[in-house]
């Protein structure tokens, strides 16, 4: 277990009512950070997360991150609640099939494609922009974007997802080069399949066995493994890894 002290540090974790976001919020709080838990639809779950976090001063906010203006307001609201923002974790995302095989009408396909890009790329970009304004004023900070293995190998039936995550990796690298002078570091994590509610339909039966067999470890990642990577990247020890994309895929895809 990584041992770090995040006392007097604050974090906004998007999509933290469940899955990787929840595990990340819990780990940051255990390390001493005050955490703002963001959700869109899981209000009950988000309240449960906040109630279970160790320490005091945590908060909860709702926002639709497919709207970049809402993403900007979310960051400002988190700063108001927390007093400052040291760590932004752009974790929220959607994974909705939109194949190009003609099974969807064009308008439906385009709407799903656009919503995927907005939620998985444009929203994090807007949140990062606003977080940088606050971090610059206070002398620095850290942004961590949760990307995907799909950015490298593509996602059949999910062209918007793969494109958005590839864009998120590139966004992270470009921001790292631009804001390093302001003592702001930017990182990305590229997990493969993770044992989450969103991935569960893909991990059942023979199809699930095939997914697990992609890794020589014959399993998928846990949410805690990804959360521990976030904790490391948010720590001072990881500062010189700014601009990197950390793979967490159990050697299921190497490049």
Mark where each language-model region is.
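Conserved glycine-rich cofactor-binding loop
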Residues: 10, 17-19
């Amino acid at each position: 277990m990584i041992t770090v002290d995040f006392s007097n540090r604050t974090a906004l974790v998007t999509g933290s009512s469940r899955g990787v976001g929840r595990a990340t919020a819990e780990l940051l709080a255990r390390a001493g950070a005050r955490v703002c838990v963001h959700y869109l639809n899981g209000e009950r779950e988000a309240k449960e997360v906040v109630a279970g976090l160790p320490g005091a001063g945590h908060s909860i906010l709702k926002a639709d991150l497919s709207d970049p203006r809402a993403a900007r307001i979310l960051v400002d609201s988190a700063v108001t609640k927390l007093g400052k923002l040291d760590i932004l974790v752009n974790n929220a995302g959607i994974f909705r099939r939109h194949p190009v095989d003609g099974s969807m009408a064009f308008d439906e396909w385009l709407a799903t494609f656009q919503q995927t890009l907005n939620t998985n790329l444009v929203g994090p970009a807007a949140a990062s922009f606003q977080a940088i304004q606050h971090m610059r004023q206070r002398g620095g900070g850290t942004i961590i974007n949760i990307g995907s293995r799909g950015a490298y190998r593509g996602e059949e039936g999910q062209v918007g997802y793969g494109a958005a995550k590839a864009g998120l990796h590139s966004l992270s690298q470009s921001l790292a080069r631009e804001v390093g002078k302001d003592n702001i570091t930017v990182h990305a994590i590229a997990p493969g399949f993770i044992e989450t509610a969103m991935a569960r339909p893909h991990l059942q039966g023979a199809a699930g066995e095939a997914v697990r067999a992609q890794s020589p470890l014959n399993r998928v990642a846990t949410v805690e493994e990804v959360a521990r990577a976030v904790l490391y990247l948010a720590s001072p020890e990881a500062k010189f890894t700014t601009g990197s994309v950390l793979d967490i895929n159990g050697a299921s895809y190497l490049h």
